[in-house]
UniProtKB/Swiss-Prot annotation:
Belongs to the peptidase A8 family. This protein specifically catalyzes the removal of signal peptides from prolipoproteins. The keyword Nucleotide-binding does not apply. NCBIfam families: lspA (TIGR00077). The active site is at D111, D127. Its main location: membrane. The gene is lspA. One of its GO terms (cellular component) is plasma membrane. The lineage of its organism: Bacteria, Bacillati, Bacillota, Bacilli, Lactobacillales. This is Lipoprotein signal peptidase. InterPro entries: Peptidase_A8.
Amino acid sequence: MWIYLILMVALVIIDQVIKAAIVSHIALGASTSIVTGLLSLTNLHNNGAAWSILEGKMWFFYLISVIALIVMGYLLWRLRGKWLYEVGISLMIAGTLGNFIDRLRIGYVVDMFQLDFINFPIFNFADSCLTVGVIFILIGVLRDDSFEK
């Protein structure tokens, strides 16, 4: 269980360091191409969710974050010993914490990764942790034979 706590802390630190670097090196709204036509770094302040849904509804995000962290903490404890679930939930907790810290500390989430080849919301490292965490959990569900009984 300790390894997952270390993983979560490391991922939250990485998320916060990336966000601090973006804010200090890229002007708000500016963009820098990393791989032409593929990936740019942008400094975007997001006080909503993807596609700006629920923009400005911070109370909602605070509430959902706290509830999600409680539920995921319980599931992490309940599903201990099933490594795919443990990794997935740990990634999701780290992602939730990374964005929750932003909302509490500065009132918005810093997003930076822009996919230039598709119309997709700009996202951050914490969002990536959430997405990869969901993938681990889906793989765990597909491989878990206890659901077949």
